[in-house]
Amino acid sequence: MSLVYVNIMIAFSVSFLGLLMFRSHLMSSLLCLEGMMLSLFILGTILILNFHFTLASMAPIIMLVFAACEAAVGLSLLVMVSNTYGVDYVQNLNLLQC
């Protein structure tokens, strides 16, 4: 296994651990999700280029489109929660609270 693959997997693991540890703030969760998507994008692109999968060459671009949509929805949710409650806690997203 190449050092590049190890670094990408470590980046994904660190982002995932950050998502598990800092899940109380919405902004931290969004940053960790973006780090996970970036490492998956780079890993997918490198694998497709190394194995010459010409049919799957659009997959990283499609994943980037979904990541951009996820970021837009997450930021709009962050703005809505910040304007409503004044803080970016994830616990404010619970619809069962009065």
Swiss-Prot record:
<comment type="subunit">
    <text>Core subunit of respiratory chain NADH dehydrogenase (Complex I) which is composed of 45 different subunits.</text>
</comment>
<dbReference type="InterPro" id="IPR039428">
    <property type="entry name" value="NUOK/Mnh_C1-like"/>
</dbReference>
<dbReference type="GO" id="GO:0008137">
    <property type="term" value="F:NADH dehydrogenase (ubiquinone) activity"/>
</dbReference>
<comment type="function">
    <text>Core subunit of the mitochondrial membrane respiratory chain NADH dehydrogenase (Complex I) which catalyzes electron transfer from NADH through the respiratory chain, using ubiquinone as an electron acceptor. Part of the enzyme membrane arm which is embedded in the lipid bilayer and involved in proton translocation.</text>
</comment>
<keyword id="KW-0830">Ubiquinone</keyword>
<dbReference type="Pfam" id="PF00420">
    <property type="entry name" value="Oxidored_q2"/>
</dbReference>
<protein>
    <recommendedName>
        <fullName>NADH-ubiquinone oxidoreductase chain 4L</fullName>
        <ecNumber>7.1.1.2</ecNumber>
    </recommendedName>
</protein>
<feature type="transmembrane region" description="Helical">
    <location>
        <begin position="29"/>
        <end position="49"/>
    </location>
</feature>
<keyword id="KW-0496">Mitochondrion</keyword>
<keyword id="KW-1278">Translocase</keyword>
<feature type="transmembrane region" description="Helical">
    <location>
        <begin position="2"/>
        <end position="22"/>
    </location>
</feature>
<dbReference type="GO" id="GO:0045271">
    <property type="term" value="C:respiratory chain complex I"/>
</dbReference>
<keyword id="KW-0999">Mitochondrion inner membrane</keyword>
<dbReference type="InterPro" id="IPR001133">
    <property type="entry name" value="NADH_UbQ_OxRdtase_chain4L/K"/>
</dbReference>
<keyword id="KW-0249">Electron transport</keyword>
<feature type="transmembrane region" description="Helical">
    <location>
        <begin position="61"/>
        <end position="81"/>
    </location>
</feature>
<dbReference type="GO" id="GO:0005743">
    <property type="term" value="C:mitochondrial inner membrane"/>
</dbReference>
<keyword id="KW-0679">Respiratory chain</keyword>
<dbReference type="GO" id="GO:0042773">
    <property type="term" value="P:ATP synthesis coupled electron transport"/>
</dbReference>
<keyword id="KW-0812">Transmembrane</keyword>
<keyword id="KW-0520">NAD</keyword>
<comment type="similarity">
    <text>Belongs to the complex I subunit 4L family.</text>
</comment>
<keyword id="KW-1133">Transmembrane helix</keyword>
<keyword id="KW-0813">Transport</keyword>
<keyword id="KW-0472">Membrane</keyword>
